[in-house]
């Protein structure tokens, strides 16, 4: 990243090795090898399925190969109450490969980072562990011998549930939203747990410009701010943080995650993680209402994806539907036991999502995002403060306006590839 540095909140060292408790934690949090992932119980990464705590679903859009990837890992780190969930939205020519690489490798790096910390890790220690894991993941992508990430990358939103705590980290515009019951009336309220890290966030734009990157929107899509090289109108990345995208890493785009901590209460019911294909057309509250109304928990993720697909067709009939990926994590750890589930979740790997209409032309360009949703309900749980948030972006989620694709027929994460070679850019 040259001289550009992240401006996230400062991580506090947990200190100490935790004595015998720390040694036991390090034994439990021993990461398996990547070639052993398929044999790990409780780890699911299929395109449609459920675990004992979560349900997942993805559907391919109309722009080519599905570049979204998902993960649920029950018993993460050997903890009975540990669950790690993630959604990864790739972009660029090799975005689908990047997203799957992150899906498989990032949890192992987080496990290793946690193993090196003391027992009973506080939020500050988890902030540090997530930061180390994300940094190691991006380093792995840069040095990978056969994966070209120069103009390809991926978002990441990860949620780790340990007991009554949620620890979250994200880069890009995939999002986590909490469904919680209102104190009075029993209705559901949506609480946005992460912030969409796009170039129009003031602190993100400031960093990019200080690193000589440019931020502006094209005339035909004025609501989509993008990141451009200082000497070329490329690549036009529509997010401020991402894995990969090394053509922009010297110009302000970073892979340092924003970290969030949430203490759960009995009113908190579930967490939705989804790619921007969902949030471009549905508000947080609409998504929570759809999941809450699902007659079957095991079908909740599929119901939300199908609702988003219908909204794309209804609201933006001239737009190409984006890939949609959803993970629904139920915080009580329970899942209904239907026998008609389309997949058992342990140790399944189906690399492609639902198949697109073969009669509709496919485009090989990745997708992109948009400014979108957050509606604060006065007096609701949504007014609770997220711990660990950088003060300069703490209010961004509530300040973001819900904005669909009005007047835009097609939105991609990248506009075009740079005209120069990687050797020229690095040299």
Swiss-Prot record:
Keyword Manganese: yes
SMART domains: PP2Cc (SM00332)
InterPro entries: PP2C, PPM-type-like_dom_sf, PPM-type_phosphatase-like_dom
Keywords for the protein's UniProt record, in alphabetical order: Hydrolase, Magnesium, Manganese, Metal-binding, Protein phosphatase
CDD domains named in the record: PP2Cc
Pfam families (UniProt xref): PP2C
Annotated EC: 3.1.3.16
Essential cofactor(s): Mg(2+); Mn(2+)
Location of the PPM-type phosphatase domain: 53-331
UniProt-annotated binding residues for Mn(2+) 1: 89-90
GO biological process: one example: regulation of intracellular signal transduction
Record text on cofactor binding: Binds 2 magnesium or manganese ions per subunit.
Highest taxon listed in the record's lineage: Eukaryota
PROSITE patterns: PPM_2
GO molecular function term, any single one: metal ion binding
Residues reported in the UniProt entry to bind Mn(2+) 2: 89, 276, 322
Enzyme class: hydrolase
Annotated catalysed reactions: O-phospho-L-seryl-[protein] + H2O = L-seryl-[protein] + phosphate; O-phospho-L-threonyl-[protein] + H2O = L-threonyl-[protein] + phosphate
Disordered: annotated span: 1-36
Family listed: Belongs to the PP2C family.
Protein name, per record: Probable protein phosphatase 2C 64
Species of the source: Oryza sativa subsp. japonica (Rice)
The organism's taxonomic lineage, starting at the top: Eukaryota, Viridiplantae, Streptophyta, Embryophyta, Tracheophyta
